[in-house]
Structure formats: C-alpha cells, structure tokens
C-alpha cells in the first residue's frame, strides 16, 4: 500500500532509525567511510591523519550532547502533556534544565524562541524520537559489529541467521535488515519489527558504548 511505504505510517519512535543507522556506518566502519571519502578532483582517499582526528573528535563532549537531547525532549513533552495557560513556558524549560543539565540555563535564556521543533505539527511532543531512534540504530549497528567484527566490539549475540548460508554473515544479516526494518515500513508495529531483526527488545548498551560512555566506575 502506498500509504505505508517509506516512513509513512511509522510510529514516531522509529521514524529516524534508518537514516541514523546509515550514519553509524560512516562514523564507525572504516571501509564504508574510505569508500566515499575521496577528494573531488584527485580522487585521493581521506588522509590517515584526518581519519584519526575524526575518530578522536567523534565522542568529544558526547555525554553533554546526549544530556542536551534529553533536556530538549523533556521540555517538549512537559509543555505538551500538562500545559497550563498561566504557566510561563520559559519557566518550564528552566525547571527541566535544573533537573537534567550540568549547567542550568541562564536566567535570561529564551531557548524556546529558537526551538522550532515544538511548534512543528510533526515533531511537537515527538522530539524524543531523535534520541530513541539513535538507541535503536546503535543497537542495530551493534548486531553487524558483532557478526562482522567491524570495530572489534562485541555487542552481544544475534539471532540465528536462517538466510542464504552461501553468503557471508554480514550479508545474511543485511538481508534480514532489508526484510525487516527496510521492507516492512509502517505495516507493523516497529517495536515488533525491531525484535524480529535483533531477536530481543532494544537496549541502550550499544549507544553508550559507541559514545564512549560505558566505562565502569571502580
């Protein structure tokens, strides 16, 4: 059905998962990045020094960035779930900032004036989907990492691959990705589709790992 193809009909929880999943390949799989990171005139590949700088910058202040996303998502939900006309929206944002941010907002802050997502018919009360989709996409990429040893990280087992045994494991998992997350569109509950692919419910473990935030405190 044309009404269920692409992102049509997909619940907001998973609308960004495919696009963010593609970003993980560029961010964390060397072969993928070097297949496209070439000079437009000389066709030379990205210098190794530049690649190493990209890796070092990848998770710079990542924890702060995730907190900022949690802050924006929470502000969005608070304003929509129980808004009272007499309550100052900026006061709501500042209260949330005190709960979540390491450095609370400045008294003169009017961040809502530039937070256009909350006034958008599509993303109003749905800004959280950016971060939640990142959890899902990181978990999905982690399956490929475990099967193909892309970064040397083991993100846990994947369900038994019943696809074509003549193909390498990564390609077989790719077939499953195509048949589930890509192929089923908005035709089924995305949570069930994700579980069909991953063999379990989503986990934030992969996102924390790739963000450099899974360090164990002694």
Name these PLM-found stretches:
Residues 1-218:
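Cation-handling catalytic/transport regions enriched in His/Asp/Glu
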């Amino acid at each position: 059905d044309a009404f269920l193809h692409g992102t049509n009909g997909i619940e907001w929880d998973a609308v960004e998962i495919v696009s963010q999943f593609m970003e993980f390949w560029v961010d964390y799989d060397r072969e993928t990045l070097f297949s496209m990171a070439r000079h437009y005139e000389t066709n030379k590949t990205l210098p190794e020094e530049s690649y190493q700088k990209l890796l070092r910058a990848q998770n710079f202040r990542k924890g702060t960035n995730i907190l900022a996303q949690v802050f924006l998502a929470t502000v969005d939900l608070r304003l929509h779930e129980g808004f009272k006309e007499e309550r100052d929206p900026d006061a709501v944002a500042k209260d949330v900032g005190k709960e979540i941010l390491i450095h609370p907002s400045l008294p003169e802050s009017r961040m809502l004036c530039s937070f256009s997502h909350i006034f958008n018919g599509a993303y109003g009360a749905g800004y959280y989907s950016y971060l939640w989709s990142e959890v899902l996409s990181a978990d999905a990429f982690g399956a490929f990492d475990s099967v193909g040893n892309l970064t040397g990280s083991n993100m846990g087992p994947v369900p038994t691959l019943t696809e074509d045994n003549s193909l390498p494991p990564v390609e077989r998992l790719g077939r499953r990705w195509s048949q589930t997350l890509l192929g089923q569109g908005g035709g089924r509950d995305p949570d069930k589709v994700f579980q069909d692919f991953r063999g379990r419910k989503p986990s934030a473990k992969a996102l924390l790992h790739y963000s450099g935030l899974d360090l164990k405190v002694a």
